[in-house]
């Protein structure tokens, strides 16, 4: 009898502690959902263009987190549009095929052989991996390249010294509207053709920004390998959480924003100048960065807005 009481004494505190932990966990879940609710209501039915690339694409656990974030966005009525690059996999295939990878001014020098590999990897491999990942989670995804239906019309970039590197001349939203209207998620690779039919490799940030502007998207979100815009690039704690358009321009002019962050910030500036509601540069190395940025008060990266 005494041993039975002792056993009961051991079990009951465990049950009590377990119940307490469960209650705390439930409170946390309720808090998270309550914080997210106004954002869900605000962005339901709105379009968000997401540039997917970098570490978030290179690591399986981060890929899964991004796919789940996108599926959740769809489930609460948001209309995401995904634009992707695929630089690391392009480099792997160039090495495998013994084609030298060349860069100048931060851009890939793209000759005809390199362009063939870029198109093969982005359109034939990376795009389908993203589409399959989203479809498995119930988000109906459709794979496209900029060339499909002349969705994106390319023009040569700069003086042509980078080869088949392009810029966006025009976006044809007529391709995307029926896809979005049916509840599908467009997944777009950043390859597009000129009016003469010549394929060009375009920076995925640029494509995402121009598509966001053409769709009059609520948000443009760039997944990157940095916390966001830093006042001191060596100090993550110097993250700027929110900037006005004029302030972003000033940071570029002062050289605070430099290197690879410059084209990303300029992409955000162009999108905002064309009517996009807000542009975000966030750390794709953080699991579920998309949800943290869109559905929480604090966010996780830098948000650039066109007005105060």
Swiss-Prot record:
Pathway: Amino-acid biosynthesis; L-arginine biosynthesis; N(2)-acetyl-L-ornithine from L-glutamate: step 2/4. Catalyzes the ATP-dependent phosphorylation of N-acetyl-L-glutamate. CDD domains: AAK_NAGK-C. One of its GO terms (biological process) is arginine biosynthetic process via ornithine. Keywords: Amino-acid biosynthesis, Arginine biosynthesis, ATP-binding, Cytoplasm, Kinase, Nucleotide-binding, Transferase. The lineage of its organism: Bacteria, Bacillati, Cyanobacteriota, Cyanophyceae, Synechococcales. SUPFAM superfamilies: Carbamate kinase-like (SSF53633). PANTHER family: N-ACETYLGLUTAMATE SYNTHASE, N-ACETYLGLUTAMATE SYNTHASE, MITOCHONDRIAL. It comes from Prochlorococcus marinus (strain MIT 9303). It catalyses: N-acetyl-L-glutamate + ATP = N-acetyl-L-glutamyl 5-phosphate + ADP. It holds the Pfam family AA_kinase. Its main location: cytoplasm. Its EC number is 2.7.2.8. GO terms for molecular function: acetylglutamate kinase activity; ATP binding. Substrate binds at residues 86-87, 108, 201. It is found in: Cytoplasm. Signal peptide: none annotated. This is Acetylglutamate kinase. Belongs to the acetylglutamate kinase family. ArgB subfamily. Gene3D superfamilies: Acetylglutamate kinase-like (3.40.1160.10). The record marks 51, 264 as: Transition state stabilizer. GO terms for cellular component: cytoplasm.
């Amino acid at each position: 009898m005494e041993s039975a009481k002792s056993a009961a004494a051991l079990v009951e505190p465990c049950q009590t502690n377990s119940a307490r932990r469960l209650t705390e966990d439930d409170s946390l879940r309720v808090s998270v959902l309550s914080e997210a609710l106004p954002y869900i209501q605000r962005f339901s039915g709105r379009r968000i263009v997401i540039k997917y690339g970098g570490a978030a694409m290179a690591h399986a656990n981060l890929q899964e987190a991004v796919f789940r974030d996108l599926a959740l966005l769809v489930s609460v009525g948001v209309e995401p549009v995904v634009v992707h690059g695929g630089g690391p996999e392009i480099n792997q295939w160039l090495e495998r095929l013994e084609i030298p990878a060349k860069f100048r001014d931060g851009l890939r020098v793209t000759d005809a052989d390199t362009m063939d590999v870029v198109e093969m990897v982005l359109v034939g491999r990376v795009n389908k991996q993203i589409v399959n990942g989203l479809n498995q989670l119930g988000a109906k995804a459709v794979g496209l390249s900029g060339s499909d239906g002349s969705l994106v019309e390319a023009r040569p970039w700069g003086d042509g010294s980078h080869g088949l590197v392009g810029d966006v001349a025009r976006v044809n939203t007529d391709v995307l509207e029926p896809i979005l209207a049916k509840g599908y998620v467009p997944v777009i690779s950043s390859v597009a053709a000129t009016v003469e039919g010549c394929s060009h490799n375009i920076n995925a940030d640029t494509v995402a920004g121009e598509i966001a502007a053409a769709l009059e998207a609520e948000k443009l979100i760039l997944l990157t390998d940095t916390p966001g815009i830093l006042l001191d690039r060596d100090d993550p704690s110097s993250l700027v959480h929110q900037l006005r358009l004029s302030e972003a321009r000033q940071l570029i002019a002062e050289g605070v924003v430099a290197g690879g962050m410059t084209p990303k910030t300029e992409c955000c500036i162009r999108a905002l100048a064309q009517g996009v509601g807000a542009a975000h540069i966030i750390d794709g190395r953080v699991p579920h960065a998309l949800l943290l940025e869109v559905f929480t008060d604090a966010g996780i990266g830098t948000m650039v807005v066109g007005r105060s």
